[in-house]
């Protein structure tokens, strides 16, 4: 099956801090990531969790260009993934306070998975995150 959800652009750039963006020039802060593999198909699913989205705060999304995908940028270049799921989590007394956002996408090809993992290692190191295997 061709991989239509993830594209990888390789351009070596000087040390660039890894970022995750929905909108051009508006880096988001990742709260958690969950990685899963379908044992039958071998497809891998990534689920990003964000406690806040800068794109939503103060309606900044109206002033920045939407990519139509989530972009992961680092010194190796850019990964573009089309979300397969996007869930907004609300809470608070009135139920209208944004408590988080979950964004999922699939990776079908091994070389794209390896590239994604290199990005995640860089992102984790730059942001004080640690990988924990729950298998």
Task: Locate predicted features.
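Long, contiguous binding/interaction regions
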Residues: 2-102, 107-135
């Amino acid at each position: 099956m061709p991989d239509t959800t993830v594209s990888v652009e390789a351009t070596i750039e000087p040390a660039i801090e890894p970022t995750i963006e929905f909108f051009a020039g508006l880096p988001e802060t990742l709260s958690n990531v969950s990685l899963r593999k379908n044992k039958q198909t071998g497809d891998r699913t990534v689920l990003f969790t964000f406690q806040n989205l800068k794109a939503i705060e103060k309606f900044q999304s109206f002033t920045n260009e939407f990519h139509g995908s989530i972009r992961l940028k680092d010194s190796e270049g850019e990964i573009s993934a089309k979300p397969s799921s996007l869930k907004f989590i609300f809470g608070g007394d009135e139920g209208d306070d944004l408590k988080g956002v979950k964004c999922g996408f699939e990776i079908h090809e091994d070389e794209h998975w390896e590239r994604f993992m290199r990005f995640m290692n860089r992102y984790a190191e730059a942001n004080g995150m640690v990988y924990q295997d729950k298998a």
